[in-house]
């Protein structure tokens, strides 16, 4: 063995920098934005990322002789400049598929965004995008139902779904919570939602909430003749408790449940998605904690990666920001990951932040959810940006109506239907937004009051995380 094995430390680029490599269709491809320490060559930084996220360690080890390192190692095959940023660069790395457990997003992320992010040779590291090969996609369950099945279940066609989060999000008793749900649904909303941080607190235990919400949903359905629903948050302390809540929602004949997929974790999320698929339940996904991970432009994980991972792990709806509301997200970037939630094939398009072609095959799509600081004046822009296969959720923009939640719901429903009608008639709804809404308000006092209430409310702040394009 001593004749074959050279102990010691060698540069990462000697093994993991392979610019001559042509990625295979079965490779998982990743794009990292790297910012190395001063004096460390780009090739060494990029190769270190490839090594530490695949087979490498800081020293040569004798046990490399027991496997085929050339087959299993990650390979950095390309380096690119980041437009407008002289200290950072893009490293493109190819990973052989056998490095990952089939269908396990947890395992993929453990490798790609694990210890390598604490590597001292790096000042910053950000996972910008992943190309999942079809051979991996076919091992994932994906959305439990998908867009088409969800529309059939809810009997909603030709427009976005309309919803809201119940406010105040914390502090209501179960009975009062149910009353607010009822007011919103009878006013014209399709769906209402638990806030992401309501689980089972002393002021309102989960079982009490589920029962009062179910009563409210059924009463609103009887009065309106429409299918209604409420996202019952099943996120819990343990997986066992999560499944107990999901089972009870099914017993109550509720159509949809909810999970906080980042705080709850991908293992729990995939398990819950599999349960929903077997039990005919829709699954709404909230992204609480995402901004801790994705907002810094040089370090962390871009949300487009988290969105792709969610589509594979499983969910029928996912929050994506609003572009026009109170939360971070520019238009082109948001459209980029909406494409990856809904389309069967998404081409490389740097203007939308997509670094790779992504073929999703026959995997069902996910509804994009716009929620956060939106009101009736935003309706034309939201419809133009998100299209029909989306869910528009107005929390404060429903409950803040001077006449109450039912009137706020009615105002949003009238505004949405007016915008859809105008779009279908060929009008440019963003340019003509004021005229469209004011015309509709002539026949809806609820909308007229809403337009007056929120006419001065805007969230005009510069985007922190911008696309790296010139």
Swiss-Prot record:
Its main location: other. Coiled coil: none annotated. The active site is at 167 (proton acceptor), 286 (proton acceptor). The record marks 326 as: Transition state stabilizer. It catalyses: 2 (2R)-3-phosphoglycerate + 2 H(+) = D-ribulose 1,5-bisphosphate + CO2 + H2O; D-ribulose 1,5-bisphosphate + O2 = 2-phosphoglycolate + (2R)-3-phosphoglycerate + 2 H(+). GO terms for molecular function: magnesium ion binding; monooxygenase activity; ribulose-bisphosphate carboxylase activity. GO terms for biological process: photorespiration; reductive pentose-phosphate cycle. It is found in: Carboxysome. The modification N6-carboxylysine is found at residue 193. It holds the Pfam family RuBisCO_large. Substrate binds at residues 115, 165, 169, 287, 319, 371. Its cofactor is Mg(2+). SUPFAM superfamilies: RuBisCo, C-terminal domain, RuBisCO, large subunit, small (N-terminal) domain. Heterohexadecamer of 8 large chains and 8 small chains. RuBisCO catalyzes two reactions: the carboxylation of D-ribulose 1,5-bisphosphate, the primary event in carbon dioxide fixation, as well as the oxidative fragmentation of the pentose substrate in the photorespiration process. Both reactions occur simultaneously and in competition at the same active site. PANTHER family: RIBULOSE BISPHOSPHATE CARBOXYLASE, RIBULOSE BISPHOSPHATE CARBOXYLASE LARGE CHAIN. The basic functional RuBisCO is composed of a large chain homodimer in a 'head-to-tail' conformation. In form I RuBisCO this homodimer is arranged in a barrel-like tetramer with the small subunits forming a tetrameric 'cap' on each end of the 'barrel'. Belongs to the RuBisCO large chain family. Type I subfamily. This is Ribulose bisphosphate carboxylase large chain.
């Amino acid at each position: 063995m001593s004749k074959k094995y050279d102990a010691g430390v060698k540069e990462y680029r000697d093994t993991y920098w392979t610019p001559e490599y042509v990625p295979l269709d079965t490779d998982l491809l990743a794009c990292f934005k790297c910012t190395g320490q001063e004096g460390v060559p780009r090739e060494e930084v990029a190769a270190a990322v490839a090594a530490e996220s695949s087979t490498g360690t800081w020293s040569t080890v004798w046990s490399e002789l027991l496997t085929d390192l050339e087959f299993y190692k990650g390979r950095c095959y390309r380096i690119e400049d980041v437009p407008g940023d002289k200290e950072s660069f893009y490293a493109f790395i190819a990973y052989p598929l056998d490095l990952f457990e089939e269908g396990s997003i947890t395992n993929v992320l453990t490798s790609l965004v694990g210890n390598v992010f604490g590597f001292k040779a790096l000042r910053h590291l950000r996972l910008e995008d992943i190309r999942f090969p079809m051979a991996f996609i076919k091992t994932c369950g994906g959305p439990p139902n998908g867009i088409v099945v969800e529309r059939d279940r809810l009997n909603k066609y030709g427009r976005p779904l309309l919803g809201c989060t119940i406010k105040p999000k914390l502090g209501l008793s179960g009975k009062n919570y149910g009353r607010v749900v009822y007011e919103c649904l009878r006013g014209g909303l399709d769906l209402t939602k638990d806030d992401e941080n309501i689980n089972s607190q002393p002021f309102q235990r989960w079982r009490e909430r589920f029962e009062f919400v179910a009563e409210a949903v059924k009463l609103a359905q009887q009065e309106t003749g429409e299918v209604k629903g409420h996202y019952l948050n099943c996120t819990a302390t343990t997986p066992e408790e999560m499944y107990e809540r999901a089972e009870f929602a099914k017993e109550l004949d509720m159509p949809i449940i909810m999970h906080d997929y980042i705080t709850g974790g991908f293992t729990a999320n995939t398990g819950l998605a599999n349960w929903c698929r077997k039990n005919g339940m829709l699954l709404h996904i909230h992204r609480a904690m995402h901004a801790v991970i994705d907002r810094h432009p040089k370090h962390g994980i871009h949300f487009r990666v988290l969105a792709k991972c969610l589509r594979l792990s499983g969910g029928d709806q996912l929050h994506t920001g609003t572009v026009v509301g109170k939360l971070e997200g520019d238009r082109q970037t948001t459209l980029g990951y909406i494409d990856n939630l809904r389309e069967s094939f998404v081409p490389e398009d740097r203007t939308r932040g997509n670094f790779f072609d992504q073929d999703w095959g026959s995997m069902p799509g996910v509804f994009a959810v716009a929620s956060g600081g939106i009101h009736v004046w935003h309706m034309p822009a939201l419809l133009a940006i998100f299209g029909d296969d989306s869910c528009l959720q107005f929390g404060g923009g429903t409950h803040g109506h001077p006449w109450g939640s039912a009137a706020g719901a009615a105002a949003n429903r009238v505004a949405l239907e007016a915008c859809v009608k105008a779009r279908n008639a060929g009008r440019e709804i963003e340019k003509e937004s004021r005229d469209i809404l004011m015309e509709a308000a002539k026949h809806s006092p609820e909308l007229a009051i809403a337009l007056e209430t929120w006419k001065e409310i805007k969230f005009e702040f510069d985007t922190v995380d911008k696309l790296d394009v010139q």
